[in-house]
Amino acid sequence: MENNNNAGDTLHPPAAKHDGAAAQANPLSPTRHAKAEEDRKKEEAAASTPTSLEKLAQEIDQFVRRLKTDGNAHNFEIPDFAERYLDLVEEKIMKYDAGEGKPRWGEVSEEDSWLLNNANRFSKLMTLVTGNYPDHEPEKISGAQVSMMNRISSIHQRLMTYLEEDFRFLIEESRIPTELDPGGYNQNSIDTKGKQHMTASEQQQEVAQEQDGLEQDTNFPGYSEETIASLSKIASEMLFGGYESECCQVYIISRRNAFEEINQKLALEKISIDEMVTKVQWETMARDMIPAWINTLKQYAAVYFPGERKLTEAVFANNQAVAAGLFSSLSRGVVIQLLNFAEGAAMTKRAGEKLFKLLDMYESLCQVISNVARLFPDESVEEIKTEMNLAKSRLGEASIHIFCDLENQIKSETAKSAVPGGAVHPLTRYIMNYLSIAGDYKETLEQVFREHTKRDRSGSTSKNAEQKNEGSWDKETPSPFAKQTLRVMDLLDSSLEGKARLYKEVALSNFFMMNNGRYILQKIKSSKEMSKVMGDNWIRKKSSDLRNYHKNYQRETWNRVLQCLNHEGLTVNGKVHKPVLKERFKSFNSLFDEIHKTQSSWVVKDEQLQSELRVSISAVIIPAYRSFVARFAQTFDPGRQTEKYIKYQAEDIETYIDELFEGKPHQSIGKRRT
């Protein structure tokens, strides 16, 4: 112990035990040397003891607040702890770069927090130390300040690069695509192809779900809430740090790829308008491409666009202007692709069979325009509406031209040969089947014609005339669509009258008009919508025309038969004039055979009309024949003479009448049935 004390005295001699002059004369005396050595060791020890990065971060935060409060950042003095803080952050970055790299987001939560906090801290430092000094007075910036600014900028850029990589990883790798939906959306089982199997109430319920189902859905398209929260934090820091462009670019590329996957899944082909017009066969377009387009349009309107807006607003929750711009940019690209397809379809060569597919597209656009437009930011709503309405108008105009072209199709039918057997003409079948289908689109066609007519009137210089026309479409005045349909029907009637004149027999000509008229009337009556279009007056007139054709047919054919059964001129002085009677029976038999032979091959496909004709003929002929035979049969000698002149019994006549109008080749009538 004593030696230790002596040793201690030697290292730290009391000042009173030394002469002051001697000490001054020897500045490297053991006493001063020991004290200097001790101070040096303390400084080295202090320097070698790592200060907590968290503590330094707190001091940096205080430093930043102080600079912000002073508002004069170009006069700051660089504290020693700031240099040390930068050293430690750089060391951490070097470890990331030299080793296995920074852990992926979510693997180490502490690392995620450290990155976010320090990115925020360096963003503030960048703002203060580089943004608060006059650019035109660089001489006021010291070299040390410039050096620190460069270091801060370099570290800040590196931290932002890490955030960008994490953002890309989360937005791309964390998406949860499914086999049915690579975009990761919940589609609520929307399938337009299956709607034909749904009841009306089910369709109404589905429409309601499409309109607001996603607003009640708390799930984001393909991402967990945890991932959304992380994306939002990273986006906030990148935007705060001045890396908005980089963040938005990553987001746009990723979500655009997701949209392309969705389009592939929905079979929406990326095709130019020129290719649609010049290269694609209409059969392919009608069978595959247009149904896929309609389905895609409705899916985007009901599911994908609302989901994308919700996702964008959540990720960029702290900057809704950026969110709105991103959604507008992404969605507008898809909208333009869809509208280009619609315009391409409208520009294809016009043909009758294209009308209803174009109307399907028109209806689909009408259904989604308002819902899609309201998703866009206010400054884009009118532009999107205008573009969608323009595409809709072009589909409407193409539809009008195709429908009006029915007139030309009727006029161009100039065949010079009559339809065998007075059957329904192929032109009649085509036009009426076409109009029957058009009846299913009545409301749409009414809208299309109304809008087209309104545009035509918009150039009128007479305001009063325009107002008069506006109020003229009431229940009693045909709508523009009805007027066009009536023109088509008038042309068809005129065409049929011309074709009826091709028949040499007046009876067959009337039969042809009756047959075709009946087909036309039944087609109109069978369509509730077309009945409304044509109106009660037209139906009554058409029914009256049919009765006249029927009467004319009866008169030209069966009145001649009835004349053979006339009793006049058969008796002289109360006695039957037998030669005249024989001639009457011979005329009846010959005429009936001729009619049966001819009209068995006439064609009536309408079973009801066929039955009505047979009944009406039987009602006229059978009673007259039965009465005639009953009155004069006993005039002939029983046996061969009776069989020679009374060839048929009334029942035979009825049977043969029932063989008329079946369109079958004539078979000779057999002998009288007994």
Outline where the language-model segments fall.
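Helix-turn/linker elements and helix-coil junctions of extended alpha-helical scaffolds
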Residues: 64-67, 71, 93, 97-100, ...
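Eukaryotic N-terminal, low-complexity and coiled-coil-prone scaffolding/targeting segments
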Residues: 1-363, 367, 651-674
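Short amphipathic alpha-helical molecular recognition features
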Residues: 48, 52, 77, 81, ...
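Eukaryote-specific, cytoplasm-facing alpha-helical/coiled-coil scaffolding segments in long proteins
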Residues: 146-157, 161, 184-195, 257-266, ...
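Acidic, Ser/Thr-rich intrinsically disordered and amphipathic helical segments
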Residues: 55, 59-62, 81-84, 88, ...
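Extended, charged coiled-coil "stalk/tether" helices of large eukaryotic trafficking and scaffold proteins
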Residues: 4-53, 58-66, 498-504, 517-520, ...
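Extended alpha-helical solenoid scaffold regions that build the rod-like backbones
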Residues: 276-530, 534, 624-628
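Context-gated lysine
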Residues: 17, 35, 41-42, 55, ...
